[in-house]
Amino acid sequence: MEREVTVVNKLGLHARPAAEFVRCARQFESSVVIRKGGESFSAASILDVLSASLDCGASMVLDADGPDAEEALEKLTALLAKFKIQEES
């Protein structure tokens, strides 16, 4: 199961939001992978997420595989949107 998303936080997915994203990804039994520019990165690895260079406007595909894949994609997508709301506060 996959979902295409765009990073909307004007600072991108830098250290603090990346750490929150990884914590969220780790709470699921499903494996979640970020695909961007022909490369794949584990959503459960802070080094992978930071290495993905997820700047503002970056488009990526979240690919989840496992029993709670749909829930994982919902929560991670909502979290990415929340970063935009926090930025505006």
Language-model-derived ranges and their functions:
Residues 1-2:
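Absolute protein N-terminus
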Residues 6-52, 56:
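Compact, glycine-rich, soluble single-domain proteins
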Residues 53-89:
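C-terminal structural segments of small proteins and small subunits
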